[in-house]
Amino acid sequence: MKVRASVKKICDKCKVIRRHGVVRVICENAKHKQRQG
């Protein structure tokens, strides 16, 4: 999980979603997981 000021899709499989007001990126590649913080 990377915590970043700006979250971006890294590959085509990445999805940007909002959970409880937190922007997250979920992907089948675990290295691409990010959240905004």
From Swiss-Prot:
GO terms for molecular function: structural constituent of ribosome. InterPro entries: Ribosomal_bL36, Ribosomal_bL36_sp. The keyword Ribonucleoprotein applies. GO terms for biological process: translation. One of its GO terms (cellular component) is ribosome. Keywords: Ribonucleoprotein, Ribosomal protein. Pfam families: Ribosomal_L36 (PF00444). Belongs to the bacterial ribosomal protein bL36 family. HAMAP family: Ribosomal_bL36. This is Large ribosomal subunit protein bL36. It comes from Koribacter versatilis (strain Ellin345). The gene is rpmJ.
